[in-house]
Amino acid sequence: LKCGALESGRLLKIIRENKFDYGIAFDGDGDRAIFVNRVYGVIEAEKLIVLFSKLLNQGNKTVISTEICNKGLEENLNNMGHKLFQTEVGDRIVVETAIEEKAILGAEPSGHYYFPNCSNTMDGLIAVFYFFELLEKHNNNFIEVIKSLNHFKRIKKDIPIENTQEINLDSLRNNIKPMINNPNEKLIIRQSMWDPVLRVYYDYK
């Protein structure tokens, strides 16, 4: 159908043609929400995670996300005095870790959001309510606030593999790790759960 969270480009086209300010796309089961702005485009989930965690700034300041989150997320949260705990990819892992760590928020770059204060699972609709609260709080300056947050440039490559059993990811990571010694860089190598590829993410300023 070419719609929903995986087709945010179509939503963006519609709101620009009709001169709407914002648009929201869900996935099939509603645990994921993507937010777009007519001028800015698709709003990065990592930036919303920062702003959501600021709204939820009560007691524990731990935020859970996955290892493939943009390096900018960690930098932004550190600047706020919050702690980022990174897990393997998977919404269930994020939720379980958030519960264990008593985190104020769990989220993935894909647009999955878990709010422990009012839900026991990922919920895109709750994210929408908090998004509206952000719009009300920042009024006409919301996009300027979004622009002010750090977000590193990213190169992403999928490397086809034939025999996954022959790949020692720990050894590969250990060999590459010494090459990435700049605090303004981040390299993640992981095996896809669905496709016969290695996914490589490199963030840099």
Features from the language model and the residues they span:
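Phosphate-binding chemistry for phosphorylated carbohydrates and sugar-nucleotides
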Residues: L1-H138, F142, H151
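Catalytic-core signal marking the mid-to-C-terminal active-site face
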Residues: H138-K205
